[in-house]
Curated annotation (Swiss-Prot):
NCBIfam families: PRK05480.1 (NF004018), udk (TIGR00235). It comes from Vibrio parahaemolyticus serotype O3:K6 (strain RIMD 2210633). PANTHER family: URIDINE KINASE. InterPro entries: P-loop_NTPase, PRK/URK, Uridine_kinase, Uridine_kinase-like. Its main location: cytoplasm. The keyword Nucleotide-binding applies. This is Uridine kinase. ATP binds at G14, A15, S16, A17, S18, G19, K20, S21. One of its GO terms (cellular component) is cytoplasm.
């Protein structure tokens, strides 16, 4: 864990569609009143997928997005270190339909609390070292698959066939190889998804304690 007490960084990992975004947004909304609207922020690991603008669409589609090599953790670590030092950063914007970054970025200023959420956060020791608390969403894979199909078809313009094919070829195998083993690095393991009220309250209390340290 980082020794810096001016910025509390919380990492929320787990399978795709396990409830990471839901629990992150819930904690964000419920803590804003206590720490201030401008003192808490959420960073999604997906924003740090590699820039693939130099590749054709055919090549982009073939990328294994569930492997650590698909993500620019170097840039994510650099941004977190800058935020801890009190510097603003430009968070990339990623397009799920174009399978690459857009030309847009979002400015993030230093915060008292930064919530990270992403499937592979706990696989990288550099990221783990920057986090003050780590969470793993331990949601059954069959439930994750149902949620993923619904989300990707309705929100990301994909076909059910392509979602199921990707799940069989990369999502599940990479979960077993990388994501599931990273659960050992979690301080808190959350069953039953992002609506687990007890887990949310425990995590909020822990963040409040870290802020007072």
């Amino acid at each position: 864990m980082s020794d810096n007490n001016q910025c509390v960084i919380v990492g929320i990992a787990g399978a795709s569609a396990s409830g990471k975004s839901l629990i992150a947004s819930t904690i964000y909304n419920e803590l804003r009143a206590k720490v201030g609207d401008h003192q808490i922020g959420v960073i999604t690991e997906d924003c740090y997928y590699n820039d693939q603008s130099h590749l054709s669409m055919e090549e982009r589609v073939k990328t294994n997005y569930d492997h650590p090599s698909a993500l620019d953790h170097d840039l994510l670590c650099e941004h977190l270190e800058k935020l801890v030092r009190g510097e603003a950063v430009e968070v990339p914007e990623y397009s799920y339909t174009e399978h690459t970054r857009t030309s847009n970025t979002t400015t993030m200023t230093p915060k008292k609390v930064i919530i990270l959420e992403g499937i592979l956060l706990l696989t990288d020791p550099r990221l783990r070292d920057l986090m003050h608390a780590t969470v793993f969403m331990d949601t059954p894979l069959d439930i994750c698959l149902l949620r993923r199909v619904k989300r990707d078809v309705e929100e990301r313009g994909r076909t059910m066939e392509s979602v199921l094919k990707q799940y069989q070829q990369t999502v599940r195998p990479m979960f077993m190889q990388f994501i599931e083993p990273s659960k050992q690095y979690a301080d808190i393991i959350v069953p039953r998804g992002g609506k687990n009220r007890i887990a949310i309250d425990v995590l909020k209390a822990h963040i409040a304690k870290l802020l007072k340290a």
